[in-house]
Structures are given as C-alpha cells and as structure tokens.
C-alpha cells in the first residue's frame, strides 16, 4: 500500500506502546473478551410482540408466498411440501416451514483456514466482522473518495487478520479495476484468502463460476475432501428481491454452492419504506418470512446444509428515500431480527455498525457504536458491516477498521456483562481495605487480579489527561489509525499476485 501523507503530531511513546501491546498479547484464558461472547440480554420485542410477528410471518408465507423461483427450485420446494397458488406464486404452509426450521443445522461452525479462527454459532454467541460492496475507498487525509480495487480488498483482509475484535472477513469492497465478472469473483476471493486466515464471506455473480471457484478452494485446502471437512468461506447470497420475490440468478448460484459444500448466508436486504414496509414491525415480519422461505429452499435440496439466516433489512430516511445505516431505527431492526431468529433457534446474521457519515468523525462514532452494541446485546451470531463502512455502504475506510476494532472491543465488553458471585462481590477486599488497609484499592491484590481479566483497554483510543494530551501535541485518532494501518501492511506477506505465483500450481 502506498503510504498516504498525513499531518503528523509529535507523540511520546504511544505508537511504541501499541506495538509492544500487540507483540505480547494476553493469553486467551485471561482475555476479558473474545469471539463468541454470549449476548441476548437486550430484547426489544416482548413475548406477545414475537407471537404477533410470528403469526404474520406464517400468514405471509402461506397466503402471499414468493414468486420468480427458477424451475429447479420450484420442483425441489414442491417436492418438500410447498405448493403453487392460482397466481403461480410459491406458497409455504406453516408445517412445511416448521419442518425446514427443524431440518436446519443448528450450532454450525464457520471455519477459518486454521482452527484458531473457527466460529461456533451457538445460540446468542456473538461475532463481529466486515461486509459490504462499497465501490469507493475513503481517503481520510484528503477527504476524498476513490474507486476501490483488488489491492484494497487484500489490504483490508490483512488488517482484519490482525484485529482481535474483527472475527471474520466478508468482502467489504468491489474490485472496480477488474471488469470481467468471472475474473472479479476469482480475484476477490483470492485477495481475501491471501490476506487473512479468518473465515471469509464472498458473493458470486453467476452459477457457472462456482466450478472454477471450487477448483481454487480444493487446491488451497489440499484436496476436495479437506475442503468439505473444513469449508473456510461462505457465500453471501441475496437469494431474494424484496418484497417476496426470489432472485433467479442468485438462487441458481445458491444451488451450485450447496452442491459444492459452501455454507450459505441467506440474505434478505429490503429497505424500510421502499422495498419493505415503512413500519419497523412490518419490515421485521417480511424479512424473516423471506429468510424462512430461503430455509425451505436450502433444506429441500440438502437437509441440514450449513446456512445462516440473514435478515438484513435497512432503514430509509423517509424524507429523501436514501438509506440510513447509522440510525437508531437500524439498531432496533437488527436487534429485533436477532431476537426473532433466536426465537426460531436459527444461526443468525444481520448488519450493524454502519454509518452515514462520510469520514471517521464524531458522527460515525455514535452511529457505529450505538447500532453495533445493540446487535451484540441482542445475541446476533454474526454482526456484519461492523467495521470500516461509511456513507451508507458506499465507502470503506482502512483507518476506520482500526478505530472500529477498539469500538468493537467495548461492545464485546458490554455483551459479556457482569459476573456476580462471591468472588466478584469482593466482600473480603472491602473488609480488608476498610479495616486494615489504606482506605483505597489501588495496588490491592484483588485489583491487580482483575485489571486484565475484567477490563478492556483500547489500542489507539486516547485516555490521557488533558495535560498529557497537550504535551503530546494534541494527537488525533485518525492519525493514530493511519499509522496503525501502515504498520499492519508494512509487516504483511506479499501482495495477492505474488502469493498466487508462489502457491498456485502452474496448471491451476
């Protein structure tokens, strides 16, 4: 990556301290946070709300149904128990939908290229990661946007590899420098795989591309059997075009992914007030109904094939019709969808942590933090779009990945919650300090015992005093993040082209 010149502030050890912290991380058994923290304490819907939404979902599937499935999908779902109405829309009786829910593989594992990065999607276990199809990269220094390229995807993957609180990497940008759709899909996938060993999410343009994709995956995994044993990518599949229509080409891609052993994210991305009802409750009902129809589709082909129920409804600013990914309503939508999917005991994914702000600034901070923590507290398994995304999904910032890693650490600490037991209630420590000690807990054995196991310390966020901040020439977080981006990429393996030349056989 070319270093972008930025206005520098004189620092006093901050960057060196961050390097030392990365070089000597805490052991996993001491870390206060990590992937798979258990959420579910935030419940925006009451039990009666859930029942009413559930009733509407089954009514929508049975009476309205979905249109435009490919012939192969229609045949498979009819055989599973769906039926075609007089209007030629595919309808789903409640018992058929519940059968699909029962057939769905629960507690799935999304594998990394190494076991360290495996994600176990048990009920309410929370993981944060990237996603998106931004066509621009944010130039934070010049306050400009430029078209995103394959190298940017690789750079983002390399950064994600080193961020403890970014647990998976779904392609966040489009390689606009690759015009041919097949070449773009293959180069995007390889840029991701080259940059990180964490689980990867990608999309594919056409069904016929899955064969060369599979050949690449088999080579990287060391054979088809090893790939199928530990599939380390998933297909983000927009199988539905809201409202209540199958996306024919995406469905054909999904069918091929199932045959190839690729886990599928069933993605319903309606926009409230445009392609979904303006009311939040109606949008939740429609999105969940669409995803449940997708579960019928998948299980009619291969019962138990690993898939994630991806309710991704977005919010519109109804004054303009533009998307508003950083709104409070977006946080509510994602959290409520998580609650509904938990009600059905399904592996869940939704989008949160986006912002409408164009740059990493105060607006982006409150937009990202408020929505990301709500999704985590609600127990969403996979929180997509939670790092780096700006401008309502139109721009992606590498510096924001660094800042958001700190933010997500605080979100995960909130998700973890408070342990209350005889040890944490600290009666003996209080008694000792008050009756025998100096009247404070600084340096107390109990304080030292929990300072690393209960508290999360950010990497680049500034917690210095105003005096120290002034003496350090008033550092700004965007400059610290930019330095961190350069550090991450300076000590990174070769570019995707170099890696491909060294790894891939000449016959590939």
Where on the chain are the PLM-derived regions?
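Hydrophobic alpha-helical segments, chiefly the membrane-spanning helices
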Residues: 503-508
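N-terminal basic/disordered segments at the start of proteins
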Residues: 2-41, 110-124
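C-terminal catalytic subdomain
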Residues: 358-453
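A hydrophobic, small-residue-rich beta->alpha segment in the mid-to-C-terminal subdomain
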Residues: 452-489
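Glycine-rich, N-terminal phosphate-binding loop and its surrounding beta-alpha-beta segment
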Residues: 71-140
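Conserved small/polar residues in nucleotide/adenosyl-binding loops
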Residues: 491-498
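Helix-rich catalytic cores of soluble enzyme domains
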Residues: 147-377, 381
